[in-house]
């Protein structure tokens, strides 16, 4: 009987984890656009170097790359 209870608790925990993941990731998924790559980085964390890598990637693949450091994050 103990195993059945553990299984139910595990299933409930998994379901809640999946639901929380979907809710929290919905805002991140809302900005996805075909053929465009947006990279968010803090302005003090190598922004310029990453922007240069993005330019090379864009030149090599044709995928538009935007490197941003949003103030509201």
Curated annotation (Swiss-Prot):
Keywords: Periplasm, Signal, Sugar transport, Transport
SUPFAM superfamilies linked: Periplasmic binding protein-like II
GO cellular component terms attached to this protein's record: periplasmic space
Compartment list: Periplasm
Family: Belongs to the bacterial solute-binding protein 1 family.
Known function: Involved in the high-affinity maltose membrane transport system. Initial receptor for the active transport of and chemotaxis toward maltooligosaccharides.
Descriptive protein name: Maltose-binding periplasmic protein
């Amino acid at each position: 009987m103990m195993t059945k209870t553990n299984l139910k608790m595990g299933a409930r925990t998994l379901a809640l984890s999946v639901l929380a993941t979907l809710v929290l990731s919905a805002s991140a998924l809302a900005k996805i656009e075909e053929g465009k790559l947006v990279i968010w980085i803090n302005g003090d964390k190598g922004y310029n170097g990453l922007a240069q890598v993005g330019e090379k990637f864009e030149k090599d693949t044709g995928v538009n790359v935007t490197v941003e450091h949003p103030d509201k994050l």
